[in-house]
Amino acid sequence: MLGGDNQFQYAPNPVEWVDSLGLRGFRNAQGRFRGSLNIGEEMSSLPSFSNKTPGQIRSSLRGRGYTSSVAHSGGEIWIKHLPDGNTSAVRLDPRMVRNPPKGFADEVPHIHKESVPTNKVQNGNYKGKDAIQYNDLGCPSNKGSNPNHARDVHIPMQPTRGLYG
């Protein structure tokens, strides 16, 4: 079999092509690591939080410069203001209790990754209509174009005792 270009490969270099965990970081003109400058960089570099415990999520966000406050949902909201005038937000929501359960995505403890213009944030909170929602990979999602929107933006957390049990 002769060598050559593989037209069916999924990436030019599968070892270096994708940085899904955001470990690469960003570098400035001098080659030093820097933080995200805009919402696209921040959302795409957030790690996957699916099935992580609230403690693991908090630790990761704290290390990235996020601050927390109480969310309107009764959970927590972690925010980080960015130089482009946007705020990155990660909401930790307790499960919604329904009797009988309807099988909705919010019936388990979950998180949301969202962005909102910084001028719309008050005391760490904002209105849902002002937010753009993202899936766990950091890609924007909306009801109009994604039939799996509700499931994609309700990222399940590992249940724990207390509020997120």
Where are these regions (language model features)?
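Short turn/helix-capping motifs enriched in Asx and small/polar residues
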Residues: 1-30, 165
